[in-house]
């Protein structure tokens, strides 16, 4: 018997090793632990690491990387960046491993701006610090991976020529925005009119929707550019958002791992993943959510280095004013760091993320805690005695004041179309529902608050059965992908040369990326707990914020494509582990070569998997047997 899915809509720079910490980051961010250091010597923790052998990948403490791995470009080595590996002799810059005033024999050297910056960040503090021969690659690699991702996302973007899955909601809402600035109702045959190229059948009554406006405004942008009467117009923004996300994940991997090779790996893996590809080729909200979340993470990553540069410069200025280094008083709390502009950018991006879907609120909480922990550890490494209390007061409170109000104002601003209208849903609710004691609030604010309360009740009570609903327990293994589209063309239909054919869109993830990424998360957890690498913790924070909250709502109707919000972090986690496999440039040639072969094999398998599943990702017409061959699990049907 032929089995077919039932398409339906839902209701409702030099490389840094993941294995070894950044300069000075011998412990997890905010852990409060530091290496015991002999004056002027290397830390005991680093000597212990050396005795166990070199840590994989191009370590943050060994700032050399080859392109390709195993080769050292001329002039690549940066002075003062060789630390003990396997018992070798180290060259340590002044103050490199001196992590507090009480342990320091030469404070005047340890608290210079150069020594502090190297201890807190490392010599390669931005792409400008890369050797001239490699600066171009810092931008070229993300660009090339984005071009690949763009080709996959924009090619045949207008296929199929129909509203796919929840496009029936969001595309029509977006067209309402283009026409009226708010959601309006549609007649029963609206989908047929859209497909026929006649979207101008809007009704005059408002439509009740339960998601904020940002994603729909972004879809509307594509329709404004290319028209709302064709699939390319209503899918353009989703494809663009997916392409930009590929660029960002590659750039973030370059920044996070300080490795050109791993930047290319991360960009390639996201570019070819089927789950992200499908979400980038259909106008649902989730790909926009993923974009703004990843952009916020990137901004906070930039702020991490910027804050440490400020701390180094201001602490060095205080030290320079005192003979023999900073005074004990200066090291009690450390300096204020002033306005953190990248945190403003992060607040803006998080506001846009929440304005796309409320589930972004969990990322706001996770990222807020993460950035404060980074600052606490920076003060600890710099030698601030009361680093915890000082970090909370001088970094934590400013972070809250900077990020949260900006995100809140941005979120409210996304409702501008609703505010400017007179007929939007619940727009006049406060006028007909006076509230004694609350009349000091503008009616528009009271009406919007009521709208949000009703939407919250809807989400809490969303528990209707759906043939493609899936439990979060199955997401990482792609247990139940959602069928977005399925048709059975007959022989004679263009592309169909057999009796029965299939044309499907199934957002099934690349098995190498998702199954390998799931294993990688377990390894990251051990690496974060055991090696206390802040990068592993940051990646896990992104996955946890997008994944774990769904377990709190076991009765709610959920779908696997919600996972695209944290998929970039899953890719970063897999890239991290591939970096461990690859090894670092100081490893023996045989070790680097074997690691390179394994990583290359993984990438080749990932590319082959995408090529194999590509027809069912993009609605190509294939024979039924070819379609059935790609349904690896019964739950995929």
Tell where the protein language model's regions lie, with residue ranges.
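Aromatic-rich transmembrane-lumenal/periplasmic boundary elements in polytopic membrane proteins
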Residues: 154-195, 398-399, 407-480, 622-631
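Membrane-interface transmembrane helices that cradle and orient dolichyl/undecaprenyl
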Residues: 102, 257, 296-342, 372-382
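Transmembrane-helix motifs of polytopic, lipid-linked glycan transferases
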Residues: 236-257, 295
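Short acidic/glycine- and proline-prone juxtamembrane loop motifs at membrane-interface regions
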Residues: 163-164, 234, 238, 278-288, ...
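Start-transfer (signal-anchor) and selected internal transmembrane alpha helices
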Residues: 1-152, 394-407, 595-599, 603
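Transmembrane-helix signature of polytopic, membrane-embedded enzymes
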Residues: 144-145, 232, 249-272, 291, ...
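Short helix- or helix-capping micro-motifs
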Residues: 149, 266-271, 278, 350, ...
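Transmembrane helical bundles and short interhelical boundary loops of multi-pass, membrane-embedded
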Residues: 2-24, 32, 38-51, 55, ...
């Amino acid at each position: 018997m032929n089995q077919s899915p039932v398409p339906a809509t839902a209701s409702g720079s030099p490389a840094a090793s993941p294995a070894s910490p950044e300069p000075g980051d011998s412990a997890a961010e905010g852990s409060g632990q530091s290496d015991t250091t002999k004056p002027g010597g290397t830390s005991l923790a680093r000597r212990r690491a050396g005795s166990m052998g070199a840590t994989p990948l191009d370590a943050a403490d060994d700032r050399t990387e080859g392109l390709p791995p195993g080769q050292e470009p001329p002039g690549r080595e940066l002075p003062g960046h060789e630390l003990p590996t396997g018992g070798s002799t180290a060259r340590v810059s002044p103050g490199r491993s001196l992590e507090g005033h009480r342990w320091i024999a030469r404070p005047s050297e340890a608290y210079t701006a150069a020594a502090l910056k190297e201890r807190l960040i490392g010599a390669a503090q931005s792409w400008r610090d890369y050797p001239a021969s490699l600066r171009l690659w810092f931008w070229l690699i993300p660009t090339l991976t984005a071009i690949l991702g763009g080709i996959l996302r924009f090619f045949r973007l207008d296929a199929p020529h129909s509203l796919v899955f929840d496009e029936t909601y969001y595309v029509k809402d977006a067209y309402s925005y283009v026409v009226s600035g708010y959601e309006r109702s549609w007649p029963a045959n609206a989908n047929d009119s859209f497909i026929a190229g006649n979207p101008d059948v809007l009704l005059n009554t408002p439509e009740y929707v339960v998601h904020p406006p940002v994603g729909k405004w972004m879809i509307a942008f594509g329709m404004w550019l290319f028209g709302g009467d064709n699939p390319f117009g209503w899918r353009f923004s989703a494809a663009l958002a997916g392409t930009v996300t590929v660029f960002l994940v590659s750039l973030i991997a370059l920044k996070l791992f300080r490795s050109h090779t791993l930047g290319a790996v991360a960009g390639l893996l996201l570019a070819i993943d089927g789950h992200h590809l499908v979400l980038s080729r259909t106008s649902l909200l989730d790909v926009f959510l993923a974009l703004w979340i990843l952009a916020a993470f990137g901004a906070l990553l930039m702020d991490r280095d910027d804050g440490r540069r400020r701390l180094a410069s201001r602490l060095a200025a205080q030290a320079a004013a005192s003979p023999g280094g900073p005074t004990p008083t200066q090291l009690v709390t450390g300096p204020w760091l002033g306005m953190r502009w990248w945190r403003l950018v992060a607040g803006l991006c998080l506001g846009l993320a929440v304005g796309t879907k409320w589930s972004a609120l969990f990322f706001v909480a996770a990222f807020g805690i993460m950035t404060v922990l980074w600052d606490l550890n920076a003060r600890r490494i710099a030698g601030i005695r009361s680093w915890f209390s000082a970090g909370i007061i001088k970094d934590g409170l400013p972070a809250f004041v900077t990020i949260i109000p900006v995100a809140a104002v941005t979120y409210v601003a996304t409702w501008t179309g609703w505010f400017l209208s007179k007929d939007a849903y619940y727009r006049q609710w406060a006028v007909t529902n006076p509230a004694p004691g609350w009349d000091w609030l503008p009616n528009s604010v009271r009406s919007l608050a009521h709208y949000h309360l009703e939407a919250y009740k809807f989400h809490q009570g969303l528990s209707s059965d759906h043939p493609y609903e899936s439990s979060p327990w199955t997401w990482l293994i792609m247990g139940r992908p959602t069928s977005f589209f399925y048709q059975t063309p007959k022989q004679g239909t263009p592309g169909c040369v057999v009796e029965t054919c299939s044309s499907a869109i199934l957002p099934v993830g690349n098995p190498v990326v998702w199954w390998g990424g799931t294993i990688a998360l377990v390894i990251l957890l051990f690496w974060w707990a055991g090696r206390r690498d802040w990068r592993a913790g940051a990646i896990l924070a992104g996955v946890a914020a997008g994944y774990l909250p769904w377990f709190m709502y076991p009765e709610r109707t959920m779908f696997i494509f919600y996972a695209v919000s944290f998929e970039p972090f899953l890719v970063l986690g897999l890239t991290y582990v591939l970096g461990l496999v690859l090894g670092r440039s100081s490893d023996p040639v045989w070790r680097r070569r074997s690691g390179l072969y394994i990583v290359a094999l993984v990438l080749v398998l990932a590319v082959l998997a995408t090529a194999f599943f590509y027809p069912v990702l993009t609605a190509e017409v294939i024979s039924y047997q070819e379609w059935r061959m790609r349904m690896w699990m019964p739950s995929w049907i």
